[in-house]
C-alpha cells in the first residue's frame, strides 16, 4: 500500500510539473517569418506616413477616392495609437526612425494627462506613454500615467458604479463598452502609487458593465444609459451597430479585450469566465467568416456582402493571444489557432496594404461608424495599433 501511495504521489508531482497547454502550444515558423516581413513592410509604410504629419497632428484614416489623409490633434480618442504602433514596430524591427517618431509624438500628447472631458485616456495615454515606459522607461512617464488616471477617475460615479463616457446630456449617464479597455491605465496607476483607489474604480466599473451591458448569449450592447441620480438603467442601445439588438463587432472586441485585462490584473475568475463567454460567442457565431475577420456587425444586413471590420479583427486577435495563456486544454488551442488564423489573414494582401498605398496606413478594410456612413472600408489607426500588438504578442509567445 505504501508503495502504491508513493507512486501516486510521484505521479501527482510529475503532473504538476508538466507545462500547461498554453506553454506547449508552438508558434508556426512560417507565420513568424510572415510576421517579421509584415513588420518590415509596416515600418516602410509608416516612414511614408510620418513625412505627411506635422508635429501636432496624428493620423486617423485615409480616403482613397479623394486621396485625403485625415488627421487630428492630440485630444480625440485615437491620438495614442500612432505612437503606440510605432513603438511596437520598433520592438520588432529595431528601426530607430520609428522610435524617434514615437518620442516626437509624445510631446503633443503630454498635455492630455489633465483632460477630464474624455473617458478615453486609457487609449490615449496608456497606448502611448504606457508603451514608452515599457520600452524605454523614464520617471516622467510615471507621473503622466498617474495624472491621466486621476483625470479619468474624475468621471467615475459611485452612484452608477461606472466611468461616464459621453457628456452630451448631463441628465443621462452614458457608458459604452469601449470603456473596458481604458481600465488598464487605472491598474498601472495603482502599481505606480500603491493607491488602491484606481484599482477599485476599475473593478467597480467592470462589475457594473458585466451586470448591465451583456445579453444572455454574452453579446454586448454598445451603450447603456443610467439615471445619474439613482444609478438605475434607463436604456440600452447599440449606437454604432446594425440595431439595438445586434452584436456590433468592435464592441464585442472591446469587451473581450477588457475582461481579459481584468483577469490579468485581478486574477478574479469571474473575469476569466466573462472573457471566455465573449470569446466563445465570437468564435462560434455562424456569421464569422472563414478567415475570422468579422463583418462590421455580426447581425449586419447583407452578409456575406457586408463590409468587414479589420479593426475588430485586430483587437480580437490580440486579445485571444493573451487569453490563450490563461486557459488550458482544448480551449487554449482553440483561441491560439483562431488568433493565428486572424493574424495570417491580416498579414496577407487581402488586408495588408501594398507598399506606397493606403495613405501609409497598414491595414485595409476597417469600418468606423457604419450607421452614420462614416469611415467605411478605410484604414483606421486603431486597427493598425492592435495589429502591431498582435504581431508582437505572437513573436513573444
Predicted regions and their residues:
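Bacterial Sec-dependent N-terminal signal peptides
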Residues: 1-30
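Glycan-recognition and catalytic cores of secretory/periplasmic carbohydrate-active enzymes
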Residues: 23-397
